[in-house]
Amino acid sequence: MEELGRRLAHFRKEKGLSMKELAENVCDYTTIFRVEKGKQLPRLEILNDICMKLEIPFQSLF
């Protein structure tokens, strides 16, 4: 879970997005926050939407 959070934070920062910007139209800000901190695993649907917004392959998070 922590590795997923680290990778998500890396790709988000690489795109120059804040947590709130990434969460927009995808999920709650708190979901992004908890995932990046290794406290929560999001549903696959949300992970897919995050990857689409970041323009990265789904496998990049694992």
Which positions does each model-derived feature cover?
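Short, conserved catalytic or interaction motifs in soluble domains
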Residues: 37
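DNA major-groove recognition helix of helix-turn-helix/homeodomain DNA-binding modules
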Residues: 45-60
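Alpha-helical residues within helix-turn-helix
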Residues: 10, 20-21, 49
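Short amphipathic recognition helices of helix-turn-helix/homeodomain-type DNA-binding modules
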Residues: 25, 60-62
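A short, Lys/Arg-rich alpha-helix, primarily the initiator
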Residues: 1-14
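Short alpha-helical DNA-recognition segment
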Residues: 16-34
